[in-house]
Amino acid sequence: MTLQTISDELALTDRKFTFLCGHDSNIEAILGALEVEDYTLPNAIETRVPIGSKIVICKWLGDDGQEYSSLDLVYAKSEQLRNKTILTLDNPPMFFSLSLQNLQKNSDDLYKFEDVQERFQDAINAYNDLPQAEKLAA
């Protein structure tokens, strides 16, 4: 299960980078399961999950010793896709900060990491509670 894999990767203390790959439908399912607030992406024809989108979840260590997390959707602008331009530091993709329903960000636009972990676990539990027929359809 994708949510479990992401949650397991985020829990690893020695992991510096993980790349998991999927389709826009996978991204949409993850965003729905995590209860991401509704949004409309700027500079995109597909305003929810454009082709080639990535969910980027960063784990940060604060000066207070607490772990924090950010969730962003990274995607190419429609003109970058249309013109087939290479994404570089001078021609970067768009970064859109995602918000989770009923969770508060701090002044740095970050969530407490434990709250994000709990959100993942809630979504995993909700999936596990589904009848088998619904799991097969998902």
Language-model-derived ranges and their functions:
Residues M1-A138:
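Non-catalytic terminal regions with compositionally biased, polar/charged low complexity
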